[in-house]
Amino acid sequence: MIVIPAVDIRQGKCVRLSQGRADAQTVYSDDPAAMAAKWEGMGAARIHVVDLDGAFEKTPKNLGAIKKILETVKKPVQVGGGIRDLATMETYLDLGVSNIIIGTEAIRNPEMVKDACKRFPGKIIVGIDAKEGMVAVEGWTETTSVRAVDLARSFEDAGVAAINFTDIHRDGMQTGPNIEQTRAFAQAISIPVVASGGVSTIKDIKAVKTLAKDGVVGVITGRALYVGTLDLAEAVSEAMEGVDPDYNPF
């Protein structure tokens, strides 16, 4: 299992939000690229980048900051936030982004997502954010009546590289990941799952690691790294114990 540090960008700065709320923001760095380089230096296999302005405004807003990250780190960089069309995906991929994360459009326009999987094979990750098991969209501001597991199942044959599954109630709260919900979600589908939300300590990494047999191939962590309750090097060592160091689930 790989540990993927999150670099969330808002107005060019590296920030973290609590439960996706724009009014609950903490700024951790004015230089997202330097932060990405720090995580790479501590053993990150890839970097998870979110354009928060893009997520809220429905169009990419931090291309400059993301381009600088791509120029700074050598590890794969996956990007999400405000990606609503094939042209934007192509722009990111041409810049050197390894994987595109599609969230809201996965439920708004699933056919476009399936088309993207055909046009950019192995490059598309679907981000499913759940609130009490139901899909949340538009930067987590709207909860739908669609079950997260049903949305995931609809992409079973599309060629999706992975699904990032986020429990919104846990994200940015450091309350521990929802292990049972994540296990049930991963067991219900055949697509590799990356867990997200609630990781706060090495104990949580160990807990998520037990889900590897259920199809969880990675875990995204953010605030815990920034506030210091989780050491990335230790987390990577724990997650990759007994695993080929070149392991790449994507």
Swiss-Prot record:
BP term (GO), one: L-tryptophan biosynthetic process
Keyword Nuclease: no
InterPro entries: Aldolase_TIM, His_biosynth, HisA_bact_arch, Isoase_HisA-like, Isoase_HisA-like_bact, RibuloseP-bd_barrel
Assigned GO CC terms: cytoplasm
Pfam family, one: His_biosynth
Disulphides: none
Name of the coding gene: hisA
HAMAP family: HisA
Primary subcellular site in the record, as a coarse category: cytoplasm
EC number(s) recorded for this UniProt protein: 5.3.1.16
Name of this chain's protein: 1-(5-phosphoribosyl)-5-[(5-phosphoribosylamino)methylideneamino] imidazole-4-carboxamide isomerase
Keyword Amino-acid biosynthesis: yes
Any one GO molecular function term: 1-(5-phosphoribosyl)-5-[(5-phosphoribosylamino)methylideneamino]imidazole-4-carboxamide isomerase activity
Known pathway: Amino-acid biosynthesis; L-histidine biosynthesis; L-histidine from 5-phospho-alpha-D-ribose 1-diphosphate: step 4/9
Compartments it resides in: Cytoplasm
Record family assignment: Belongs to the HisA/HisF family.
Species this chain originates from: Desulfatibacillum aliphaticivorans
Key words, A-Z: Amino-acid biosynthesis, Cytoplasm, Histidine biosynthesis, Isomerase
